[in-house]
Regions:
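ATP-dependent carboxylate/acyl-activation modules
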Residues: 1-295
């Protein structure tokens, strides 16, 4: 069987012990033995998926992204302004907004991007903004924006180790579906892309698909197809069907942004990636880098 022109893998119908002698004899002739139908079919399924993925491996795409100055700075989290700049340069749609350093600037930006708005403290040293009161949502008037700015700014200044860049002003987004798209670096395999339902659904459903980078938009489409939450993107419960091509393109571009930080990336996460019909926007962005290893 080991020299047969097609693969032959014996699978026992019941899970039984096989002696070392029997296993050695089978291995000598290039034969793999799987005990039990459940274990055997699972192993064969994994082997086929590995074969399919191996056939999709491509040479890395040309890097379109130049890592901004933050990549050369001290290791740790980036200011969200720098993280947004990285994604925008890679071609990831980012929710419009601006950095305000005064209440007047916050009001000007709010009316430019459209009320109601969200305000977030912007500091590389403050990653969990909500925990310190550094986020206010749904501000719909000039007075609310001014009050929100002062509140958020004060929350940031109350963190002794934080350098506050300003207050990020962005429009509120409602409806649609929230996704998570992020990249972490595995010590053995390198950068790994995770895609799943975002927002409140991340911990509830634990519904994610993983790939090693690089990926293209076609591969991201396959990742989306693996999600149990795919019906939400297809218009379930009265939501507008999402443009899966637009979603896939944005996530593939996020992968390019991660690859631009080769050698320094620890984590890059967008949660949520807001999707509403053909609109796709990164609402919250986190980038963490580390010092480049000396060669």
């Amino acid at each position: 069987m080991g020299s047969a022109p097609i693969p032959i893998i014996p699978v026992a119908t019941t899970c039984v012990n096989v002696s070392d002698y029997s296993r050695g004899l089978l291995r000598k002739h290039g034969i793999t033995f799987l005990g039990g139908l459940d274990l055997g079919m699972t192993a064969l399924g994994h082997a086929l998926r590995w074969l399919e993925n191996r056939g999709r491996v491509r040479a890395p795409a040309p890097r379109r992204v130049t890592a901004p100055g933050e990549a050369a700075a001290a290791a740790g989290p980036w200011s969200e302004v720098g993280a947004r700049r990285l994604l925008a340069e890679a071609g990831v749609p980012v929710v419009p907004g601006g950095l305000a350093r005064s209440a007047d600037e916050a009001v000007e930006i709010a009316f430019r991007v459209g009320l109601p708005v969200a305000l977030k403290i912007c500091s590389a040293q403050i990653t969990h903004k909500s925990d310190i009161g550094g986020v206010v949502l749904g501000l719909g008037s000039e007075a609310e924006v001014r009050g929100g700015y002062e509140k958020v700014r004060a929350a940031g200044q109350a963190v002794p180790e934080a350098t506050v860049d300003g207050v990020l002003v962005t429009p509120m987004r409602t409806g649609g579906t929230e996704l998570l798209a992020g990249v972490t670096v595995d010590p053995a395999f390198g950068p790994v892309l995770a895609v799943g339902l975002g927002g409140i659904w991340v911990e509830v459903l634990n519904d994610t698909s993983l790939r090693l980078l690089p990926v293209d938009a076609a591969e991201v489409r396959r990742m989306l197809g693996e999600l149990r939450g795919l019906p939400l993107l297809q218009g379930a419960r009265g939501t507008a069907p999402a443009s899966l091509d637009a979603v896939a393109g944005a996530i593939a571009a996020l992968g390019e942004a991660a690859l631009a930080l080769d050698g320094t990336l620890r984590a890059l996460e967008v949660n949520p990636l807001w999707v509403n019909g053909d609109q796709v926007e990164a609402l919250d962005v986190l980038v963490i880098t580390e010092a480049r290893e000396q060669q």
